[in-house]
Amino acid sequence: MDKKLEELVWSRANGICEYCQVPQRFDPINFQIDHIIAEQHQGPTSADNLALACYTCNHQKGPNIAGYDLETNETVPLFNPRKDSWSVHFHWDGAELQGAPIGRVTVHVLAINRDFRIALRRSLIHEGVFPPQ
């Protein structure tokens, strides 16, 4: 990936994971650039298919583009940071991320509400630096 494209992804996201919203400065593991539609699914390495992701979100997401929603009994696409509005699909309930079907499935597949991730967000909330504005 060329440096200019990498810089675009970082600046567009303002150094914040585009899935869980945790800023890089509070995560000891370097963020990664995620192919929203994985290369193995013929997703291009282009600005409209790339998102900044923390290691955990990117690792959990893998090549997935959808998940099964137990509430609607339907296969639902994962949140796409280039096409979907974060605030339409997600909302914070304290340190836990909740959402409508796309948000709910994304939270599940990316394991966004795992205990260690909630603990980090609680600490950041207590310090007054989360969620990002």
Regions found by a protein language model. Give the residues of each.
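Extended charged
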Residues: K3-K4, P23-F26, H59-Q133
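Short linker/helix segments within small regulatory modules
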Residues: I37-L50, R82
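Short cysteine-rich loop/turn motifs with clustered Cys
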Residues: D2-F31, A51-K61
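Residues at the C-termini of beta-strands that transition into short coil/loop
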Residues: I37, C54-T56, P101
